[in-house]
Regions:
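Nucleotide-activated chemistry modules centered on ATP-dependent adenylation/adenylyltransferase
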Residues: 1-111, 127-371, 381-384
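Short, glycine-rich nucleotide/cofactor-binding loops
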Residues: 111-120
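Residue-level micro-sites within transmembrane alpha helices that shape
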Residues: 119, 386-387
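Residues flanking N-terminal targeting/processing segments that define the start of mature chains
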Residues: 370, 374, 387-391, 406
C-alpha cells in the first residue's frame, strides 16, 4: 500500500477577515449567500441527501431550499403534516391495503425493516407486526463501535419479538474506508451510511422479501419537499447499473484495489444492488412515514413503553436530546464535522421564541459549566435545530398541555 500524504499548503490570505463578501469562495456547491430559515434557523448550507457511492471531494451538493416566504422545505413539510394537508386516515387505509396484499401466512417473512433498535426502527417494526399483522425481518448494519446503550437497545428490539440479522463489516476494510472518508470528504460516517442505505434491499432480494420499510422520508429534514409525495424511496440511493463510477471514501474501486490492495470481495458488502436484481425480485423500498404521522419524540415514548428503550446517559453532542444518534461511539465526531462543514448540527424543523429562550438559558448554563464562553458559542447554539423545540412546537400546535421543562 502506498503512503497517502495529507499535508496541504494553505493559502491563509483566502480567509482574511477583511475580504469583501463578493470575493469569498464557496465550496462544494453550497450557496455563497448564507440564509437562515425564519422558523427553524437551519441554514441553506445544509446539503440534501446524496448518492453516497458517487461522493468525491469534487462533488457539487444540492442544498436545502428556503422558499420565497423565508421558510425552508423542512418546515413546510412539518406544516403540511399538522395543518390538514394530508389525509392520514386515507394514508392508513392505503397501508392496510398494501399489507393485505403482501402479508404471508406460510411462516415466511413478508417485509423487512432495517435499523439499529433505536426509537424509529423499533417503532416501525413494532407497528408493522403488532398493529398491521405483518411478519418483519429486521436487519442491522453494525455501527463502527457500539455504545453500551446502543447494544442494549438492539437486544431489547430483538426481545420485543423480532428476528434479526446483524451485518458487521470486515474491520480492516471498515477502518480504511472510514479513514479515507474522513481525509478525503471529512465524512467519517460514510461507511456506516453506505451500509445503512444498501444492506436492506440486498437482504430483501436474498430472502425474497418484497417490501422494505424505512421510517421518515429525508424530506422531513430538508430534502426537496416534493419527495414526500410518494411512499417509494429513490432507487438510485441503493441500486445501480454501472459499477465503473463508484467511489468509497472518495476513492474509486479501481484505486482501492490497485493502490490500497483491497480485495474485491472485501468491498462487495458496501456496494449497491444491481437494479436488475431488485426488479427481478420485485423489491419495493418504502417510507412508513408516508403512511404514519411520524413524530420523533412520539417514537421515543413508544419504544420506551413497548420495548424498554434506553436513552443515553448524556445528551447527544451539540443537541438537547438523549435518544438521537446514540448507537455509535463516533457519532459525536460526525456531528462536529457536520457543523464545521455546513454550519449545521442535528436537524429539527420548528421553533418558538419562548421555547428557544428557555432552552438557550439552559444551554448557556451547560456551556459555562463546561468552561466555554457563551458569547463565542452563540453561533453554534443558534445553528442547532433541537429535537425538543420541534417536539414542544408539535405539542403546542396540537393544543395539548405540556410544560417545556418536561420536554427538555
Amino acid at each position: 500500500m502506498e503512503k497517502n500524504p495529507r499535508y496541504v499548503e494553505i493559502d491563509y490570505a483566502k480567509y482574511a477577515p477583511d475580504i469583501p463578501e463578493d470575493q469569498l469562495e464557496a465550496y462544494y456547491g453550497l450557496p455563497k449567500h448564507v440564509q437562515f430559515c425564519n422558523e427553524c434557523v437551519m441554514s441553506n448550507q445544509k446539503p440534501n441527501s446524496c448518492y453516497e457511492f458517487e461522493h468525491t471531494i469534487n462533488s457539487i451538493k444540492k442544498t436545502m431550499v428556503i422558499q420565497e416566504d423565508g421558510v425552508c422545505d423542512a418546515c413546510h413539510a412539518c406544516h403540511n403534516k399538522a395543518n390538514g394537508h394530508i389525509d392520514w386516515a386515507l394514508r392508513e387505509k392505503e397501508l392496510r391495503e398494501l399489507c393485505d396484499q403482501y402479508r404471508k401466512n406460510d411462516g415466511s417473512y413478508d417485509c423487512l425493516v432495517p435499523g439499529s433498535g433505536g426509537k424509529d426502527s423499533f417503532y416501525a417494526a413494532h407497528l408493522l407486526k403488532y398493529k398491521y399483522g405483518m411478519h418483519p425481518l429486521t436487519v442491522t448494519w453494525a455501527p463502527h463501535i457500539y455504545t453500551p446503550w446502543g447494544w442494549e437497545n438492539m437486544q431489547a428490539w430483538i426481545h420485543a419479538g423480532f428476528d434479526n440479522y446483524l451485518c458487521t463489516p470486515n474491520g480492516m476494510t471498515h477502518r480504511l474506508l472510514t479513514r479515507l472518508a474522513t481525509e478525503n470528504l471529512f465524512h467519517p460516517f460514510q461507511p456506516f451510511i453506505l451500509g445503512q442505505k444498501q444492506l436492506a434491499p440486498k437482504m430483501a432480494a436474498k430472502f425474497g422479501i418484497p417490501l422494505v420499510f424505512y421510517g421518515e422520508n429525508e424530506a422531513e429534514f430538508g430534502n426537496p419537499i416534493a419527495d414526500n409525495n410518494s411512499a417509494l424511496r429513490d432507487e438510485h440511493f441503493f441500486a445501480v447499473n454501472d459499477y465503473d463510477h463508484i467511489y468509497l471514501g472518495g476513492v474509486s474501486l479501481r484505486q482501492l484495489e490497485e493502490d490500497y490492495k483491497v480485495d474485491k470481495a472485501d468491498l462487495a458488502i458496501y456496494l449497491p444492488s444491481e437494479t436488475s436484481n431488485l426488479e427481478k425480485n420485485h423489491i419495493q423500498v418504502r417510507y412508513l412515514g408516508y403512511y404514519e404521522k411520524w413524530h420523533p419524540q412520539g417514537a421515543y415514548y413508544y419504544s420506551v413503553e413497548h420495548g424498554g428503550f434506553r436513552p443515553a446517559p448524556e445528551r447527544t453532542q451539540g443537541t438537547y436530546s438523549k435518544y438521537n444518534s446514540i448507537d455509535d461511539k463516533i457519532d459525536d465526531f460526525f456531528i462536529k464535522t457536520c457543523f464545521m462543514l455546513q454550519f449545521r448540527d442535528i436537524k429539527r424543523v420548528g421553533q418558538t421564541a419562548d421555547i428557544q429562550n428557555k432552552i438557550r438559558l439552559r444551554w448557556d448554563a451547560e456551556l459555562e459549566a463546561e468552561g466555554h464562553d457563551c458569547q463565542t458559542h452563540g453561533a453554534l447554539r443558534a445553528a442547532v435545530l433541537v429535537e425538543q423545540v420541534a417536539d414542544a412546537l408539535f405539542v403546542l400546535r396540537g393544543g395539548e398541555q405540556a410544560g417545556i421543562d418536561g420536554i427538555i
